[in-house]
Design a protein with these regions (language model features):
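A short-motif feature that recognizes glycine-rich, charge-decorated loops
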Residues: 1-440
């Protein structure tokens, strides 16, 4: 028994010793010193203070960008060009807070071994206080996952990650404004389009487009905005000098698809698009040269006038009406909104769901096509007031063969409507009902 107790004591003592050893050799994480220092930063600059960038590539042309008085970047060398503001900002974001992957040498006497005596890339930045910084990029690391860099005047050699090198290694084509039309879309007040053997002119009043030519017509603003988006998004595709000559030749011999003009208070810009075989080519009044254009741009010019016309009978859209009046033969419906509630002509509070259903049916009224004649004595008229009753719209509707023709008050345009839309409107009007009485 005594011998067994002795054995137990030895086991307990060994366990306590092991626990003490583990405790002394496994300190809490927060007290364990870092195994290595964080790699040092190479550059820490305020991006907003940088007003000039110089990029030199070994064996290539030097590219210089500078901020103008409005704070926008411009290419000033090798020739004056607009700059892609987003691309320049992205590059500066990487450069102004450039981290190293590691510090290779604190002080070296042989930059040549890293390719830094004759760097493949040099990026110089000038701040508004005239202070300059020159980053030199040398050879790739042996594993090709980074590159050697240094700052001019600094004896240290660092490595940076390959993705950082990619974000800094930019050409003229990467940084220039590649838009074929450089006007800002929200400033454009007029669009002229010559395409499909037709000339169409659009004018914008606030956020609404109207057709001005060939005659004043209501425009589908969504369709005009889509045309404008294609024009302002059109970008050049750069290639070699040989490709440029082929592109110019293809444009010259191609068939004209469209000429589009965009106008703002500051002037007008023009884009001509031609098609040669299956490809589109574009020439701009503000950019030298001829460029291949995307199919998205080229195919956007094949719409007819009617494609840009507003087929909706009413303009109130998704604004809530304030007042609705419908006459359908001997039937009449009067609805007025007060606060959040709808009221009938005889002062009864109406069921909101049935009124919203009727409003939806009025919104749904749109033309299947436009007609030149056929309107006769109307059997239905619908009047809608909206925008705090500042907008009043009235439409007259007459039976026409198996469908209906509608005409907005004081406008000559005739809209052919599917008979199912009118039937849905009539049924929804019949289904109007007073609000349920609240239980006391």
């Amino acid at each position: 028994m005594k011998f067994n107790g002795f054995i137990v004591a030895i086991v307990v003592l060994a366990a306590l010793g092991g626990a003490l050893y583990w405790s002394n050799h496994h300190m809490p994480a927060e007290t364990t010193p870092a195994s290595a220092e964080a790699p040092p930063k190479i550059l820490t600059l305020n991006e907003a203070d940088i007003n000039k960038i110089d990029i030199k590539k070994k064996g290539g042309e030097e590219v210089t960008l500078a901020k103008d008085s409005g704070g926008n970047w411009k290419v000033i060398a090798p020739k004056p060009l607009g700059a892609d503001q987003s691309a320049v900002s992205s590059m500066l974001s990487s450069l102004s807070s450039l981290n190293s992957d590691r510090l290779v040498e604190e002080k070296t006497s042989n930059f040549n071994q890293y390719g830094l005596s004759e760097p493949t890339l040099q990026i110089g930045v000038t701040e508004k206080n005239s202070k300059t910084h020159q980053l030199l990029v040398g050879d790739d690391t042996p594993t090709n996952n980074g590159a050697y860099v240094r700052l001019e005047g600094d004896p240290r050699v660092f490595t940076i990650a390959a993705y950082n090198k990619t974000s800094l290694d930019k050409s003229l084509n990467d940084l220039r404004d590649k838009r074929l039309l450089t006007l800002e879309s929200d400033k454009i007040s007029r669009i002229e389009l010559i395409a499909n053997k037709q000339e169409i002119e659009f004018g914008r009043n606030k956020d609404q487009w109207q057709i001005l030519r060939p005659k004043p017509l209501r425009a589908d603003s969504a369709q005009v905005d889509e045309l404008l988006r294609k024009l302002t998004d059109a970008k050049m595709e750069s290639g070699s000098e040989t490709d440029s000559k082929k592109t110019a030749s293809a444009f010259t011999s191609g068939a004209r698809v469209a000429i589009a003009k965009l106008t703002t208070d500051s002037g007008t810009q023009e884009l001509e698009v031609r098609k040669n075989k299956d490809d589109y080519y574009a020439k701009s009044s503000v950019v030298d040269g001829v460029y291949k254009a995307s199919n998205d741009v080229g195919q956007g010019f094949y719409k007819k006038l009617d494609d840009f016309r507003n087929k909706k009978l009413f303009d109130f859209g998704f604004s809530d009406p304030d007042k609705i009046e419908i006459h359908d033969g001997s039937k009449a419906y009067f609805l007025t909104k007060g606060g959040q509630d709808w009221w009938s002509g005889d002062g009864k509070k109406m069921d909101a769901t049935s009124v919203e259903s009727l409003i939806d049916k009025i919104r749904d009224l749109q033309a299947t096509k436009f007609l030149e004649s056929g309107f006769n004595t109307p059997s239905i008229d619908v009047t809608v007031s909206s925008n705090d009753r500042k907008r009043r719209e009235k439409a007259l509707i007459a039976k026409y063969k198996d469908s209906y023709i509608a005409k907005r008050e004081n406008e000559p345009v005739l809209y052919e409507l599917d008979s199912k839309l009118i039937e849905a409107l009539q049924n929804s009007a019949k289904d109007l009902k007073p609000a349920a009485m609240s239980k006391k």
